[in-house]
């Protein structure tokens, strides 16, 4: 017998979708409006964030609280990529294996920070972590 999801659980699902939506719209704004071309790792992170926006929107519409089963793997992989990207940005990964500087745009520019302080890869990592935490909370509230 599954516990009956409360209105609070649906609000958490909505919040999860909003985090994914804001992340997706922000990435599109930076790339399309500001004209900043994403690096290779940014593209991979987008490949995991963009589908989350659609999946979580459908889950909200259908009140599908089992969404964690297929959204959490995307979130964990996206977070792992964002973590590696953050380490690259911080210079903690050696130069020879940095995919961002070999060809295409670099992650080391000043345009890769929010307000000149928080790097965009760290923001992506934060978004993936928030989504993962919310999905785990939803799972715990709806699974016996």
From Swiss-Prot:
Cystines in this chain: 39-42, 100-107
Organism domain of life: Bacteria
SUPFAM superfamilies, per the entry: DsbB-like
Cited Pfam families: DsbB
Transmembrane segments: 10-29, 44-63, 70-87, 116-138
Membrane topology type: Multi-pass membrane protein
UniProt keyword terms in alphabetical order: Cell inner membrane, Cell membrane, Chaperone, Disulfide bond, Electron transport, Membrane, Oxidoreductase, Plasmid, Redox-active center, Transmembrane, Transmembrane helix, Transport
Subcellular location: Cell inner membrane
GO CC list: plasma membrane
GO BP term, pick one: protein folding
GO MF annotation list: protein-disulfide reductase activity
Function: Required for disulfide bond formation in some proteins.
PANTHER family: DISULFIDE FORMATION PROTEIN-RELATED (PTHR43469), SPBETA PROPHAGE-DERIVED DISULFIDE BOND FORMATION PROTEIN B (PTHR43469:SF1)
Family: Belongs to the DsbB family. BdbC subfamily.
Listed name of the protein: Probable disulfide formation protein
Origin species: Metapseudomonas resinovorans (Pseudomonas resinovorans)
Upper taxonomic lineage: Bacteria, Pseudomonadati, Pseudomonadota, Gammaproteobacteria, Pseudomonadales
